[in-house]
Structure formats: structure tokens, C-alpha cells
Regions:
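Reductase modules of NAD(P)H-dependent flavoproteins
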Residues: 156-261
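A short, basic/flexible loop-to-alpha-helix module at the beginning of a structural domain
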Residues: 114-126
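Conserved beta-strand elements of the Class I
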Residues: 129-130, 224
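Signature of N-terminal electron-transfer/Fe-S-associated modules in redox systems
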Residues: 1-36, 67, 110, 130, ...
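Histidine-anchored nucleotide/phosphate-binding helix
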Residues: 140-150
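Short, surface-exposed secondary-structure boundary micro-motifs
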Residues: 9-11, 62, 115
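Ferredoxin-reductase
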Residues: 14-109, 163-165, 190-193
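Short, conserved phosphate/pyrophosphate- and ester-handling motifs at nucleotide-, phospho-/glycolipid
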Residues: 54, 137, 228
Length: 261
């Protein structure tokens, strides 16, 4: 059985925020769906944690193994409410997520290190954006969208979010509210396995395919993709080979499964 780990090229840029180890305290736990938990973490008060929207942290477990989760909060939120939010999906049999869904309590202290990852918005570009997420791959996209709104970045952005069932799109209402305030945001929810009782009338099928259906040419776009490796890999190969997306205009964080030790 598996928990989730994020794989990403490290930032080598000199301006990248410094990586630090720190204790974090569980501030609040909230179930967003039957198998996704929002975990609010409080950071050490004396310790300014700098990161870029889209980056992730790693928990260091007692046995030394690590679990990586994208930060769903944009950095500017720290100024008013120090702390970060993570979206953790339950992988039954996974040591860490079983703990999160079974035993984790408010005030518990965890060890973390970060920030890591190169999944942050390239702000020197004004190209229109496609954000592609599957499942909890939405977490860093939430941070990117919040950051864009805060910074007044008006680049057109099309968000495609895929889940098996409608309830897997756990921040659907939040996105619709944001879109009302961000006229440049287009939101396309996609469900791959809708059941009759879901009464789903929206787009169906695979989320990476919905982008292929909507865009004949991605040569002038940038794509940011996060989620299951099959989604990210299918998107990368098909957009570059069939939709003229330049290879260097595809940015991704893929969740890969790591067997629990």
C-alpha cells in the first residue's frame, strides 16, 4: 500500500527561498470529502517561512522516511494568518495517511522541511495559462490562483480539474466564487466515473483529454499540471506532440506512489 510522494526538480535559482527544517503544529483538521483532509499547520512564530506559490513541504517521519505535500496557501496569506494548508488524500494502508485520517489530533507536532519544487508561476511571461489538476493535485493550483488574484496578474487562465466523481472536486464552490472575482479565469470541471445518482451534467472523461478537445493549438500557452503521473505524462506527451506546446512551456509536479516502509 502506498502514500503519496511528490517528485520534482529542485530549484537551483539563487533567489529561491532557503530550505529549512522546522516543527509544525496541527492547527485544524477538516474533511473536504470522504477521503480528502484539509490540514492547517501552524509554523514556528519566530521563524519566517518563505516559499513560492506552488511549492511543497516534506514531513519527516519517525523512521526517517518522507511524505511530500503541496502547500495550498499563497505566501501572502502568512502576513495575516501565519500557517499553511495542505490537502491530504487517504491512501488506505498507507502509514502516514492512515494516521492523518485515524489518529492525528489538533496540537500534534510534526517535523517538516521545505520549501521544495519548481512548480511556481513564471511571472516574466504574459502567455495565457492552462492549469490542469487531478484530485489533490489541485492544492498547488489553489495557491497559484490565490497568488495571481492577490498580485493582480490578469493573464487568461483556464483551469481543468478532474476527479472520478463530482465530490472529488472538493473545492468546486471556492473556485466558482473566485471565478466571479477573476474574469480572466475559466473553470472546467471534468468527471471520469460519474454515477447516475451524481446527476452530473458537466464534462466527462479524462481531464487531460478535455484540454485536447478545447484547444487546437497550444503553441502560445503555458501549461501547469499537477496530479497523478498518468495524467501529467499523458498531458505532456499529447500537448507537445499534437498541440504544438513548446516543451519548455510545460511545468509539472507528479505525485508518485511510494511504498510505505
Amino acid at each position: 500500500h502506498t502514500d503519496v510522494v511528490l517528485e520534482s526538480r529542485q530549484v537551483t535559482d539563487a533567489s529561491a527561498p532557503p530550505i529549512k527544517k522546522m516543527p509544525v503544529r496541527v492547527g485544524a483538521l477538516e474533511k473536504l470529502s470522504h477521503d480528502v483532509m484539509r490540514v492547517q499547520l501552524q509554523l514556528p512564530a519566530n521563524n519566517v517561512f518563505k516559499y513560492l506559490a506552488g511549492q511543497y513541504i516534506e514531513f519527516i517521519l519517525r523512521d526517517g522516511s518522507r511524505r511530500a505535500y503541496s502547500i495550498a496557501t499563497a505566501p501572502h496569506v502568512q502576513e495575516t494568518a501565519p500557517g499553511i494548508e495542505l490537502h491530504i488524500r487517504h491512501m488506505p494502508g498507507g502509514l502516514f495517511t492512515d494516521h492523518v485520517f485515524g489518529a492525528l489530533k489538533e496540537k500534534e507536532i510534526l517535523r517538516a522541511e521545505g520549501p521544495f519544487g519548481s512548480f511556481f508561476l513564471r511571472e516574466d511571461s504574459d502567455k495565457p495559462l492552462v492549469f490542469l489538476a487531478s484530485g489533490t493535485g489541485f492544492a498547488p493550483i489553489q495557491a497559484l490562483l490565490t497568488h495571481m488574484q492577490h498580485q493582480g496578474i490578469t493573464r487568461p487562465v483556464s483551469l481543468y480539474w478532474g476527479g472520478r466523481r463530482p465530490e472529488d472536486l472538493y473545492s468546486d464552490a471556492w473556485i466558482k466564487e473566485l471565478a466571479a472575482r477573476m474574469p480572466q479565469l475559466t473553470y472546467v470541471p471534468v468527471v471520469s466515473d460519474a454515477q447516475p445518482e451524481d446527476n452530473w451534467t458537466g464534462r466527462t472523461g479524462y481531464v487531460h483529454q478535455a484540454v485536447l478537445d478545447d484547444f487546437a493549438d497550444l503553441s502560445g500557452h503555458e501549461v501547469y499540471a499537477c496530479g497523478a503521473p498518468i495524467v501529467v505524462d499523458s498531458a505532456r506527451s499529447s500537448y507537445i506532440s499534437q498541440r504544438m506546446l513548446p516543451e519548455e512551456a510545460f511545468f509539472a509536479d507528479a505525485f508518485t506512489s511510494a511504498a510505505d516502509k
